[in-house]
Structures are given as structure tokens and as C-alpha cells.
Amino acid sequence: MALGAHQPSAVILGVSLLGLTLSSCSSSGISTAPEDPASALSASQQAAADHNLLLLATVRTSTMQREMQQAADAGYSLAGIQGGKTAWGTWELVVVMQRNSDSTSRTEYRLLATIKTSTMEEELQRAGNAGFLYRAQTSLDKETIVILERNRDLESIQRIEYKLLATTKTSTMQQELLAATAAGFNFAGVTVAEHLFGGKEVVTILSRPVTGN
């Protein structure tokens, strides 16, 4: 992901990365914050407290959600995400967090990771019912990864309805996209992932706000 002409200093945590391009994320605006947010960071993250960028890399998605939340509690927000093989052929999820000194909102992140697209759609909808907004998606081996966020300071929750489309044929995806947008859904993101039974699968996520009860 391009970070502009003036690129702030960055601190890299985990393995060094060769040839990884970070995908851009849509912006919108969430786990329980520790009493002292800064104290939740690791020693190396604490040393990076004056830097604008933080790079997180892990093979476990559960670890990534925890580290993202710790960074968010210290004032960072999601800037980019990519899943892939790093230097030694290990599948890793890589996330870049960026500090925004002007932001005063408290953000909670939720990371979803599933092999089955049907399971992902169910988990997406549970997150949408809780007011989580789509931020980004990628793939990691045969897993589809989606990151959502919500502002913990909001007094009321805007529920979101999500729709996940998955097909091996792009022509079929075009037809399903047209039908979804005609029903009021807005495009959120798309990835090409390894299918559970081999081959590639196009995975597209759309959303629309829930109105009424």
C-alpha cells in the first residue's frame, strides 16, 4: 500500500519481509481496553512508541487480533493487511498499524478467519449485528481473513447486513454482484483465495445498513 511521498519511520516486528505488498483498507472506526493502554504493548512495541507505523507479523490469527487490539489501545489504527509466504516459506499474516494523533475514538477490532465461506458469512453477520464495520480482507493459505472494527464510544449501534459471494467463475461473480447491488448492497472488498477442495475462488463481500427493527 502506498503511504505517500513523506513516509514516516516504521518499526518492523517479527520476520523481515521480502516482496510483500500491503493491500489498502477502507476506513471507518473496538476488545476491552486495559487500564493503561501503553502497558499492553510488548517491549519492542514500547520502544516504538514514538513511531507512526507498527508492523505486526504472525502465523496465528488469534495472536494477530490480540496484538492489533493492544496497538489500537495505544493509539494505532489499521492501515494495511496482507497474507502470504515470507522469507522462509512460512505462511504469515502481516498487518501495518498507523498512529493517528488527532483521533480520540477508542477502536475495537475483530478478526475473522475461516476456511469455509459459509462459516465466514455467518461470522460476518454476527459481527454486523454487533455494529462492526468492514475494514479489509486477505487470504492466508486456504483461509479467508476479514478484519472489522467499531467505535466503542458510540452510544448506539448501527447494525450492518453482510453478503458474501464466492465462486470459481468470474462471469458468475459479475451476475451475483449485479443482483446484490440492485438489492442495495455496497461493495466492500474482494480477494482470490485457495479453494478448500483445490483451485482458486473469488470471494467478494458486500454490506448495507440495517434499517428498522
Regions found by a protein language model. Give the residues of each.
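C-terminal motif of bacterial Sec signal peptides marking the signal peptidase cleavage site
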Residues: 21-24
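Hydrophobic helical h-region of N-terminal Sec-dependent signal peptides
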Residues: 13-18
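Bacterial N-terminal signal peptides that target proteins for export
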Residues: 1-12
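Terminus-proximal functional modules
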Residues: 26-213
